[in-house]
């Protein structure tokens, strides 16, 4: 029903960007990825930056196809993940493949890891050190830049049941959600999910 209403609105006003974005969400829910890729072409013609989203939707289209799991993976890994944090996150979340993704785009997923990696990166190093996944002998005199990680490390060292709690804020409409989103469920924008974390001391943890 929503699809029919939006298509009618676009017949009356074909350059209605908001209606196109709403239709994009409807298509996503219906898993009509090919139609969505065509729709992104319309948004591009109207001046919208859709390059990253287009690659992301290609990944969803491959995932929904009748290809074998290995073929799906092969096609998805050929997509352009550089400078595309959402596609990079998708690859890590789906296949657990590290492609030097930005820490800020996958930190909540990293929280579930039980082995440290990419320690040449300061953010990764501090994070895994705070979680106790790096031996203290390997990291003497750590100078934390991230105050949350420093607090987490201190609390854990003093036998507090400290943890990180995550929430997700849309940088466009400022809505805060309890779960990660690739498209904001409120304003429908892509790649606007900012992962927020804070230290909590939870004795029931």
Model-based region annotation:
Residues 2-8, 33-46, 69-83, 102-121, ...:
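Alpha-helical repeat scaffolds
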Residues 19, 36, 52-53:
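TPR alpha-solenoid repeat register
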Residues 30, 50, 66-67:
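Structural motif corresponding to the intra-repeat A-B loop/turn of tetratricopeptide repeats
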């Amino acid at each position: 029903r929503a699809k029919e209403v939006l298509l009618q609105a676009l017949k009356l006003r074909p350059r209605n960007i908001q209606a196109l974005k709403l239709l994009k969400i409807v298509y996503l829910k219906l898993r009509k990825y090919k139609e969505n890729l065509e729709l992104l072409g319309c948004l591009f013609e109207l001046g919208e930056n859709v390059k990253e989203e287009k690659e992301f939707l290609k990944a969803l289209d491959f995932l929904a196809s009748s290809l074998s799991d290995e073929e799906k993976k092969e096609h998805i890994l050929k997509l352009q993940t550089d400078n595309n944090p959402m596609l990079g996150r998708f690859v890590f979340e789906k296949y657990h493949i590290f492609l030097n993704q930005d820490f800020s785009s996958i930190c909540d997923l990293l929280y579930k890891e039980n082995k440290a990696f990419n320690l040449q990166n300061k953010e990764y190093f501090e994070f895994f050190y705070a979680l106790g996944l790096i031996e203290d002998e390997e990291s003497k005199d750590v100078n934390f830049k991230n105050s949350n990680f420093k607090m987490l490390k201190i609390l854990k060292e003093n036998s507090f049941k400290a943890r990180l709690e995550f929430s997700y804020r849309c940088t466009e409409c400022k809505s805060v959600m309890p779960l990660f989103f690739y498209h904001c469920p409120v304003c429908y924008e892509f790649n606007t999910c900012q992962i927020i974390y804070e230290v909590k001391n939870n004795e029931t943890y």
